[in-house]
């Protein structure tokens, strides 16, 4: 792979093209714990547009200005009132917009098999920036990088301001306006009269919180692609593993050919994604060579918008997530079949209803605290993002993205991010970050690698 030569061409501030109708938004019980998390960094790889890069930059700047008028909190700054409550001041201070050129990099350099190339981290700004820094830094930034034969658009957003659902809502709207839409199709909901609104105060030391993981340990990062067929096989194993030896692979896929992995038909059925997560939990635990009695943890984030009664607006803007830790001794997880671990995950997700969400809010109010991101005991996995997110809806006018990639933010041994496959047929890409020796073990784990397939390069 050629060396990455990133040249900063320009940097400016993009302001909303209209004055905000929203003045301030108070951070919620779900927002505040994220102040110690780094900015979300996600972006899309695109083919070169059918017009000049200079024209693209102008189009993006104009559409971003319009988009910010639809999402005024992102153009603001954080403020803390005398009582210690943190708010978003929707003051229209603007966001950063960077133009970068990397003429030696090609699209296939980014899509190459094996580890994610380090140059991808250069496609984002606000590297290692904690969300608390939104008190004095922009709450978002967009970086446009011109490659030899393509474009990468990287977006960095304060994690105390958005979760993944709101992040991709913003990105999709940005793409929609860039395509020429005169009116956006999905308006964000800035209502703060929800169960997450609280009078509890989390006190911060002078200068704000520190990151909850070291970030200095050696890591490897790789994208593992799971086709729709592989996902269906995993789901079948998790639900009907005892019957698996009696049927051929083609029969299994045929049996589940009408499966929609996004919608589980029964509360008793383990979903496709839960099946995939359970397989990853098993294989990473085996690759870590833990003591049999060591307690392993698989932490999942759940979207609470539809779990509340009454439900939140699907386009509620902000964080509306809670974390579910699932624990199991290493020996039990590995001694049992896939369905055992998958059933643990399934039961915890199904149990996370309105009452559980409210209980989580009350628990936080009794003991306000930051989100414990990291892997302190060496036996944890944290699953972030979601293959449900509409990442490939970011067509800016000349075709959907070739791939989705993320920056350096919030990565540590055991951090996994789930993306939809580009096929958008139920396939999944897992962005896996592990210690080098664990990654080597995972790559040699036949149980999971039988389901992994290569993504073809661009011709």
Task: Please give the residue ranges for each predicted region.
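Low-complexity, glycine/alanine/valine/leucine- and proline-rich hydrophobic stretches
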Residues: 376-458
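Soluble acyl-CoA-dependent acyltransferase catalytic core bearing the H(X)4D motif
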Residues: 2-24, 36-391
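Short, surface-exposed beta-strand/loop micro-motifs that present aromatic residues
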Residues: 33, 139-145, 413-421
């Amino acid at each position: 792979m050629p060396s990455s030569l990133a040249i900063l061409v320009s940097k400016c501030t993009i302001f909303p093209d209209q004055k905000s109708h929203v003045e301030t938004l108070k951070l919620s019980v779900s927002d505040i714990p994220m102040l110690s998390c780094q900015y979300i960094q996600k972006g899309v790889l695109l083919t070169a547009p059918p017009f000049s890069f200079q024209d693209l930059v102008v189009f993006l700047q104009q559409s971003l200005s319009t988009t910010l008028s639809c999402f005024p909190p992102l153009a603001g700054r954080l403020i803390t009132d005398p009582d210690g409550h943190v708010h978003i001041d929707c003051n229209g201070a603007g966001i950063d917009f960077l133009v970068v050129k990397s003429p030696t990099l090609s699209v296939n350099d980014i899509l190459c098999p094996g580890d994610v190339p380090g140059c991808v981290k250069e496609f984002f700004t606000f590297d290692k920036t904690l969300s608390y820094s939104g008190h004095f830094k922009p709450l978002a930034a967009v970086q446009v990088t011109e490659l030899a034969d393509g474009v990468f658009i990287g977006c960095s957003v304060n994690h105390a301001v958005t979760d993944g659902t709101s992040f991709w809502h913003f990105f999709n709207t940005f793409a929609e306006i860039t395509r020429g839409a005169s009116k956006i199709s999905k308006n964000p909901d800035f209502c703060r009269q929800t169960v997450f609104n609280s009078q509890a105060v989390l006190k911060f030391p002078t200068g704000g919180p520190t990151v909850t993981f070291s970030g200095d340990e050696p890591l490897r990062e790789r994208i593992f692609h799971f086709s729709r067929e592989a996902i269906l096989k995993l789901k079948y194993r998790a639900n009907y593993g005892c019957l698996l030896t009696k049927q051929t692979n083609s029969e299994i896929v045929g049996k589940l050919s009408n499966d929609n992995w996004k919608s589980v038909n029964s509360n008793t059925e383990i979903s496709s994604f839960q099946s995939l997560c359970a397989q990853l939990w098993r294989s990473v635990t085996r690759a870590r060579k833990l003591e049999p009695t060591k307690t392993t943890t698989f932490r999942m984030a759940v979207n609470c918008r539809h779990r509340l009664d009454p439900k939140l607006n699907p386009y509620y803007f902000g964080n509306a997530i809670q974390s579910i830790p699932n624990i199991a001794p290493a020996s039990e997880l590995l001694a049992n079949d896939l369905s055992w671990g998958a059933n643990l995950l399934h039961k915890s997700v199904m149990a996370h209803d309105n009452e559980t969400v409210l209980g989580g809010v009350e628990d936080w109010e009794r003991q306000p605290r930051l989100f414990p991101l990291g892997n302190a005991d060496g036996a944890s996995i944290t699953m972030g993002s979601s293959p449900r997110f509409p990442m490939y809806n970011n067509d800016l006018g000349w075709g959907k993205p070739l791939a989705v990639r993320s920056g350096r933010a919030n990565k540590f041994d055991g951090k996994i991010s789930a993306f939809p496959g580009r096929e958008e047929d139920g396939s999944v890409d897992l962005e896996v970050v592990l210690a080098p020796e664990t990654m080597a073990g995972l790559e040699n784990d036949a149980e999971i690698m039988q389901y992994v397939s290569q993504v073809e390069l661009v011709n």
